[in-house]
């Protein structure tokens, strides 16, 4: 059965000068410790991936590791509106201007050979989720800004 791309609705508003952010809400592989998961992502997966991302136009890539110790800090922030803590182990955010660039990266033979298999070593790919949206930036480096910096 061949894969066919889904129909994409037309975008609302101007996207000139805007960047997309792919957010992967990740879970670690069952049985893997939080520290082993973080270690693999930071010290094994990231070094293998970051050069390829630059090659395909990625503007920024970050990992936010939500270990038990940092999730416990949420108790200091709870209020009547914010009281539910997300249980994801990591948020990985990839920023790029054109979705076609990211698609080409995933089709790169090196990505296919090295990174797809690596994901299976640390990630619970059946439970992890993702979403994508346009970045609207308001504060950068302690300064008020009008939009994401396009440099």
Swiss-Prot record:
UniProt enzyme class: oxidoreductase
Keyword annotations for this protein, in alphabetical order, are:
Monooxygenase, Oxidoreductase
Q: Which residues form the EthD domain?
A: 30-125
Its biotech or industrial use comes down to: Notoamides have been shown to exhibit antitumoral activities. Notoamides A-C show moderate cytotoxicity against HeLa and L1210 cells with IC(50) values in the range of 22-52 mg/ml, but the IC(50) value of notoamide D is greater than 100 mg/ml. Moreover, notoamide C induces G2/M-cell cycle arrest at a concentration of 6.3 mg/ml.
Example GO molecular function term? monooxygenase activity
Where does the source fall among the domains of life? Eukaryota
Q: Which residues form the signal peptide?
A: none
InterPro entries according to UniProt: Dimeric_a/b-barrel (IPR011008), EthD_dom (IPR009799)
E.C. designation(s): 1.-.-.-
Q: Which SUPFAM superfamilies match?
A: Dimeric alpha+beta barrel
Q: Has the keyword Oxidoreductase been applied to this entry?
A: yes
Describe the family membership recorded for this protein in Swiss-Prot or TrEMBL: Belongs to the tpcK family.
Please give the function described in this protein's UniProt entry. Answer: Probable decarboxylase; part of the gene cluster that mediates the biosynthesis of notoamide, a fungal indole alkaloid that belongs to a family of natural products containing a characteristic bicyclo[2.2.2]diazaoctane core. The first step of notoamide biosynthesis involves coupling of L-proline and L-tryptophan by the bimodular NRPS notE, to produce cyclo-L-tryptophan-L-proline called brevianamide F.
Protein name according to UniProt: Probable decarboxylase notQ
Source organism (scientific name): Aspergillus sp. (strain MF297-2)
């Amino acid at each position: 059965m061949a894969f066919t791309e889904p129909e994409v609705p037309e975008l609302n508003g101007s996207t000139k000068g805007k960047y997309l952010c792919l957010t992967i809400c990740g879970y670690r592989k069952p049985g893997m410790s939080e520290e082993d998961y973080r270690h693999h992502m930071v010290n094994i997966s990231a070094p293998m991936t970051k050069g390829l991302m630059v090659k395909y136009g990625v503007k920024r890539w970050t990992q936010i590791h939500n270990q038990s110790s940092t999730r416990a800090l949420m108790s200091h922030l709870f209020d009547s509106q914010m009281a539910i803590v997300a249980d994801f182990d990591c948020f990985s955010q990839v920023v790029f201007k054109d979705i076609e660039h990211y698609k080409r990266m995933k089709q790169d033979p090196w990505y296919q050979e090295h990174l797809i298999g690596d994901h299976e070593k640390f990630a619970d790919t059946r439970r992890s989720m993702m979403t994508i949206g346009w970045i609207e930036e308001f504060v950068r480096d302690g300064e008020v800004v009008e939009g994401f910096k396009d440099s």
